[in-house]
């Protein structure tokens, strides 16, 4: 039952503006600060093919595809251990939400793990957070441990994936931009 509390809070915060910021909601659900979905990410085996197809469906140009820096350069960890994993990424800006396509490169990432276990499909919902430590504490208290984290390639923020697959069917990502370079 506890695991459904956070899902209820997230759905309510999306559907009923102001509810999640009320004192009652914060107290009952430990308010992890997941107020705004900014990203839906899909893991794929072939990012070139997938990005062309998504561009056709969305009626948009194919965005640039880039390869992330090796994990050791961005302080990446996977399941608590340093990782040198990488990914090819592309982003479709859809207004208030970004569609991210991810093709894992190498081992040691949640991207590769989920692609191997479940095949192509939704990897995570990305939420913008103000306080990543608060989000981590709250989500871990809900039973969602950190599975994978690191810094942006631009070194001006962090991403943290929480293992919420079993009860929510998808990972939760907390995205925090700290503005430093």
Language-model features, listed with the residues they occupy:
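Bacterial N-terminal signal peptides
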Residues: 8-18
């Amino acid at each position: 039952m506890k695991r459904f509390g956070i899902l209820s809070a997230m759905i309510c915060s999306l559907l009923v503006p102001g509810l999640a910021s009320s004192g009652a909601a914060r107290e009952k659900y430990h308010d992890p600060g997941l107020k705004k979905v900014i990203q839906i990410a899909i893991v794929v085996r072939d990012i070139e093919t997938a990005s062309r197809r998504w561009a056709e469906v969305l009626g948009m140009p194919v965005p640039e595809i880039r390869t992330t820096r090796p994990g050791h350069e961005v302080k990446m960890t996977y399941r608590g251990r340093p990782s040198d994993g990488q990914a090819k990424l592309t982003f479709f800006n859809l207004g208030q939400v970004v569609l991210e396509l991810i093709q894992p490169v190498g081992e040691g990432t949640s991207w590769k793990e989920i692609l191997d276990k479940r095949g192509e499909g939704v990897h995570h919902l990305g939420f913008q957070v103000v306080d990543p430590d608060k989000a981590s504490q709250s989500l871990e208290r809900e039973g969602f441990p950190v599975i994978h984290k690191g810094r942006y390639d631009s070194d001006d923020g962090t991403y943290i994936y929480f293992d919420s697959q079993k009860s929510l069917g998808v990972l939760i990502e907390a995205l925090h931009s700290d503005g430093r370079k």
